[in-house]
Amino acid sequence: AEFNVPILADLPGARELSLNAATRHSDYDTFGTTLNSKFGFKWKPIDSLLICGTWAEGFRAPTIADLYSGGSQSFDFFTDPCDSVYGAARTNPAVRARCAAALPAGVNAANFRQQQQGFTPTTAASSQTPLAFVSGSNDQLTPETSTSKTLGFVWSPGFIQNFNMSLDWWEIRVENTIISDTANLILNDCYINDIAARCSAFTRDPVTGIVNNLKRTGINAGYREVEGFDLDVSYRLPTDRFGNFSAQWTSTYTSRDDLVTTKNAVTHPNPRTGVGWAGYAFRVRSNLNLGWEMGDFGASWTVRYFSGMKEACLSAVTFPEECNLPNYASPNNQG
């Protein structure tokens, strides 16, 4: 059900004021019922300015594939935190102590080496396991729930025809985030984040100490929370003799992007803003497009900008100087 309620119109300070409310009831055989609502407002104090905001709940059930697609084997690339050359144990005493407790009695944690294909010591920060790991679905997944908030404005000044500018603030928090687990996440949670429950997802060879069995599935992470701003500026200039010119600049600034990969309450969020991770969370993304049209002809020029990023390199403890990228711009010409 959805309701749009006009409150005021054509008054000084309120050319338009309206409220919006919507709610949806869903019934799932696997998860029961859920009720999710959304509320919003629009306020136009003057003809050239529109202010709007929303608050909404969200719900996403796991797909059939997430729950029941079965399993398969794969030879994953990963970094063992206990590796004495590339792992976090090299420089982190707490990780080194946890590794010493987990490795077989005959293996010296100070000299332990992860093994790659061919059962030889790894020669890179991320190496392929010589033993197959198991990946697949998870019939214990539960639905994601979310809360989102937005607030913004659109400005279309009368003294500049065909000019529009909008700025929006947004914040989204997703609980029980469904993510694809990885060998790195599991091992890092066990040894670096000291989450004991995650250590049960794998075993080590009783003689060599290498990871000989690991199962990864989709999991419900603790939460993901993102916050940022969207800016959109556009202008069109029509002419009688030279065609129509246009310009549009869109930018997104991510002020916060936190991820907790476990429901463990004491785990601190992993701040992803400006740090390369799955999906690469650039702090700033920007696009500028210039266009021209005349009759059957047209041309456009686009440039994309991504702000500088520090990569969450798997070997950051060993090679920190290799974990940075400069600002990046990519032009695109079309005609």
Where on the chain are the PLM-derived regions?
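Hydrophobic, lipid-facing positions within transmembrane beta-strands of outer-membrane proteins
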Residues: A1-F3, L35-F41, L49, S137, ...
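Transmembrane beta-strands of outer-membrane beta-barrel pores
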Residues: I7, T23-D29, W55-A61, Y68-G70, ...
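Transmembrane beta-barrel domains of outer membrane proteins
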Residues: E2-P6, A22, G40-K44, T142, ...
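Extracellular loop and loop/strand-boundary signature of outer-membrane beta-barrel proteins
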Residues: A22-D27, G136-D139, K215-N220, H268-W277, ...
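Gram-negative outer-membrane beta-barrel transporters
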Residues: N162-L314
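Surface-exposed extracellular loop regions of Gram-negative outer-membrane beta-barrel proteins
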Residues: A1-K44, S146-G152
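Short loop/turn motifs that connect adjacent beta-strands in outer-membrane beta-barrel proteins
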Residues: L8-L17, S48, A89-R98, G106-N108, ...
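Outer-membrane beta-barrel signature, preferentially recognizing the C-terminal barrel domain
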Residues: A65-M165, L214-F229, Y280-R283
